[in-house]
Amino acid sequence: MSRYWSPVVGTLSPYVPGEQPKLPDLIKLNTNENPYGPSPKVLQAIAAAAGDTLKLYPDPASDELRGAIAAAVGVQADQVFVGNGSDEVLAHVFMALFRHGRPVRFPDISYSFYPVYCGLYEIPYQVVPLTDDFRIDPADYQPGGQAAGGIIFPNPNAPTGRALTRDEVERIVTANPDTVVVVDEAYVDFGAESVAPLVDRHDNLLVVQTLSKSRSLAGLRVGFAVGNRALIDGLERVKNSFNSYPIDRLASAGAQAAMQDQAYFDRTRQAVMATRERMSADLRALGFDVLPSAANFVFARHPEHDAAQLAARLRERSILVRYFRQARIDQFLRITVGTDAQCEALIGALKKIFSL
């Protein structure tokens, strides 16, 4: 605490990122990184861009990157907004589109950055409980009285991994024509349906994605939003009031290559999905309750073993998983899908723990 802080700073409860330890030989299944490295074409593109032009500022509009994203997603380039990771994109969303003096609505169990942004920008919010089986129910987002200041949810949801169908998402969008509905699709490429094709049909729909997960670029920090031009223009106005150059030259080159290498993208995400199903079956065989997942992680609990203790005992065996000390989910572990060998090591460690 400092007497020099602005009043809002003391009220903030900042986001707590997943652990990024520097210890060697850890099996890291705690932050939903892709177990496969980026496309070789990404590394080639970054190497080619690492030249004398680094003395120059990058393109503030990121036109080439926006074009590559637009081509991959199936929209026009002026329907794309890019940022320094999807977290920055989301931060601009809250500032540009949600500050109406009315509560923003999002699930009670969801991405924990949402209430952080609300606190930072002094936006009121209302959490909407998931169902007893941890689903988002579109009926819970029907408007009642005054329109919400905004609606945002991940699809698939995080940390649960459960996904809505495209029709279910569209029900929420259609029911709230006077409210911007933001669908955070960080994990969509691992088995869910993107609603990006619907942005031409609904001017209140914004879709946010990241290259951190399915494109294996968590270390490069590139995210984007897709929506109608008026929403994108609002985001651009906030960006250019904050940082006109969020995407550096190396990140732009690597991200373009990642978006263009569809074959590598398909091959690695299919591998993750196949491993997820095997790991889920192995966990169930050990007695875990495992929620259906359309993400690159699973959410699981064991009826006879405390989740926090399990996480600690796995760490003793150099395996990291994510534990959330939060009501309703404090007996769950979120486990990132690793390589087959990493997931086999996890199952082996659990068997040893259970045999003690």
Swiss-Prot record:
Protein's gene: hisC1
Cofactor: pyridoxal 5'-phosphate
Complexes and interactors: Homodimer.
Annotated InterPro entries: Aminotrans_II_pyridoxalP_BS, Aminotransferase_I/II_large, HisP_aminotrans, HistidinolP_aminotransfase, PyrdxlP-dep_Trfase, PyrdxlP-dep_Trfase_major, PyrdxlP-dep_Trfase_small
Keyword line: Amino-acid biosynthesis, Aminotransferase, Histidine biosynthesis, Pyridoxal phosphate, Transferase
PROSITE patterns linked: AA_TRANSFER_CLASS_2
Organism: Bordetella pertussis (strain Tohama I / ATCC BAA-589 / NCTC 13251)
Family matches, as HAMAP family: HisC_aminotrans_2
Enzyme class: transferase
Keyword Cytoplasm in annotation: no
Protein's name according to its UniProt entry: Histidinol-phosphate aminotransferase 1
CDD domains: AAT_like
Listed pathway(s): Amino-acid biosynthesis; L-histidine biosynthesis; L-histidine from 5-phospho-alpha-D-ribose 1-diphosphate: step 7/9
Record keyword Transferase present: yes
Family: Belongs to the class-II pyridoxal-phosphate-dependent aminotransferase family. Histidinol-phosphate aminotransferase subfamily.
